[in-house]
């Protein structure tokens, strides 16, 4: 391809993407949208610079303003989560997790987490499964950990406390990880903290999905319930840039985390993202509680509305959800892959997802039986419970009534015309301007 043609096509594709999302319903639970101020910080000169090491101890010159911004980011994160120590250098949630693995384990050590099929994240997974099949999870593939699984209660969509206590006592892991990529309800941090202490295991809470809800005081508070460390990504319910952080209340543990991050894992830590995180953290301090409350309210409203429209919504007996996520079982509708593609044609952007019982019914991650829906981004656009009811009707038209998705896309576009700006920010503005 001619370089001039390639240049033009890339610019055109970026523009078309923004136009598409400006008239779509972005409902992927691991995504959100930043404010114009945060977006602008991402394109600042900070993105051209290096600042290896710790604030005040850099091995590069020219960092006095970078140090100030990173110091503010750390202070704001500590305030948000009411902790003593925060490292905001990890460039993602996965790297934040890897910092914990590096700081507190050695290759061959036993770690315990939920399997991917039960909501665990790939960063917690083993290198290979029990039958030798390649999984490639970060914990196993990168750190060389021997990953065993916590028990999961499919009916209640949560860690099975009693069975997990027994497994922890039997395996005596160095590390126990809670949290995951499917998390409808708070995980049993307090219930597992004593057994972790008794076997000498570090209790690590991965808050990648729910960090914004925790900061907004609308979810569990893992650091108050017994977690030793907490990691997060900063772009899901925490409406910042794609970045990461690690927090703790223990100074000795924090020093180990710092050394794991540098020199071990990070040289340049994406300073434009640190600046953007500082701004997002300030927004979260000012607006986070109101935002998180709206997110949970919208998730519950969407789940109930989908149920009322005739969908099989997971965990009805528990009120469906206490987080930003809603799970649909669409096995009877042709599976997650089919439903995801039909909804995408209607400009409703979701992702297919494994359900805990999918393996038993012969499904895989390529065509699972579930859809994982998120309301974080729609909430940032200002949508509320009434819009969740409208959206449930659009799902019904596409998946149950089998209307032409292209026709429904027009209705989606009409709905979105009322919600173009980012809310819960000091400077509201167009969400998908480019």
Swiss-Prot record:
GO molecular function, one term: pyridoxal phosphate binding
Keywords for this protein: Amino-acid biosynthesis, Cytoplasm, One-carbon metabolism, Pyridoxal phosphate, Transferase
E.C. no: 2.1.2.-
Obligatory cofactor(s): pyridoxal 5'-phosphate
Highest taxon of source: Archaea
Gene3D superfamilies: Aspartate Aminotransferase, domain 1, Type I PLP-dependent aspartate aminotransferase-like (Major domain)
Compartments it resides in: Cytoplasm
GO BP term, example: tetrahydrofolate interconversion
Pathway noted in the entry: Amino-acid biosynthesis; glycine biosynthesis; glycine from L-serine: step 1/1
Reported function: Catalyzes the reversible interconversion of serine and glycine with a modified folate serving as the one-carbon carrier. Also exhibits a pteridine-independent aldolase activity toward beta-hydroxyamino acids, producing glycine and aldehydes, via a retro-aldol mechanism.
Family: Belongs to the SHMT family.
Name the record gives this protein: Serine hydroxymethyltransferase
Lineage of producing organism: Archaea, Thermoproteota, Candidatus Korarchaeia, Candidatus Korarchaeales, Candidatus Korarchaeaceae
Gene: glyA
